[in-house]
Every structure is written in structure tokens, then in C-alpha cells.
Amino acid sequence: MDFAEVEIIKFFKCLNTNHVKYLLVGGFAVNIHGFNRSTSDLDIWLDDSVENRTPFVNALLEYGIEGAELFHTLPFIAGYTEISLNNGFCVDVMADLQFFKQREFNECYTIAKEFNITNDVTVRVLHINTLIKEKEQSLRPKDKIDAEQLKKLYKK
């Protein structure tokens, strides 16, 4: 799965149109930063504030997610709070990462980088140094490999 996938582009367009504060994390973020590996889902870290919940729900409604209203109160837990796009691709929604927690979201959001995935759609991606630190804290071997490969690419 890649960013050329129409449903992924449509999903990010809905997030951006509704001014949702999110960061792309996980395998797609690793790919954007230059280490290409396969990934089975799209991981997004959301600002879990009252002010961000309504735009997020509006984005889901615009995209066509049934039951989107539940996201007004549903906890954003990695591996638990998932959305299935129209193509069956899974979006994993989280309020906390392994290392970085919600209280650090705004700081991470401020230093994040925007990348164009099409001429008119951008995604906000966890900064490379933040992503490496996050991946280093994981217990999963593939995340450790991601961190090492990203360090090599950026000669950190």
C-alpha cells in the first residue's frame, strides 16, 4: 500500500480540510523519511483535545465512516481504535505513542515536517529525530531496524 492509493489520499484530504491536528507515525512515516519497508496499516497520532475531536469526527463523516460520532468519546488507543478505509486499509488512531505521550503532542507537532503526497495534499509527519527516538523505545524488532536504518540515512 502506498500514498498513490486513492482512498489514502481522500482520507488525508478530509483530515486537512477539517483542520485536524494529527501526525503521521509508524511505517508510512518511516517510508516518507527514506527507508522503504512494507506496512499493513496507517498510524496517526492525534491531538486528543476537545477542540480536535469535532474536526476529526467531521473528517470521518466527510470520508464516509459509519458511526463516526462514536469518536467524540472513544479513547484513542494504539491497536484498539481503528478505522477501515473504503479499500479495507486500516488506520490505527492513537493518543499516545510508546515514548511520546499526549502531553508532548504539541511540541512534536510544532517540529513535524509537512510532505506533499499529491500536488494538493500534504501530510504532517513526525520529525525524523522524534521518529528515531520513538522507534528506539519499541520492543518490536522491525521498529529497532527502522531506527537503525533511519540513523544511517541521516547519519545521526
Model-predicted segments: where are they?
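Compositionally biased terminal segments of proteins
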Residues: 1-156
